[in-house]
């Protein structure tokens, strides 16, 4: 009986790793969307994140909402999306302030946020945290940081 239970557990773990869509979230797709300017891709991923069962979904949803805010044309919608996204991401960081990936998401947004929204006070400390913890991050996040650092003023081609 114990053998059957262990086999079932291993099989379910394998299936969830082999198919990230089963868990409702694909990190590589998330980072692809964050680096694109495709509103449809952002919207699709937002729906996927909202439907996911991830504990971290608030951070991902917040980052996507703020990214979307920079892509829509109506001022009222921009402000609403940005505020909602900011609240979600900041709450996620507040709950887990050592989560380097969340801090990286905030850095992406802060580095490109208009000055008038006054969302740029953590850039230097976030950059330092990312540099210090880079090697401990999952490879998909490291690759996203590497790609972003080529365009970033504060991460400037972070070396692995």
Predicted regions mapped to residue ranges:
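Helix-turn-helix repeat elements of alpha-solenoid scaffolds
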Residues: 32-45, 78-86, 119-120
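Terminal, low-structured helical/coil segments at or just beyond the last alpha-helical repeat
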Residues: 125-160
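Bacterial Sec-dependent N-terminal signal peptides
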Residues: 1-25
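Short coil/turn linking the two alpha-helices of tandem helical-hairpin repeats
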Residues: 35, 67-76, 112-117
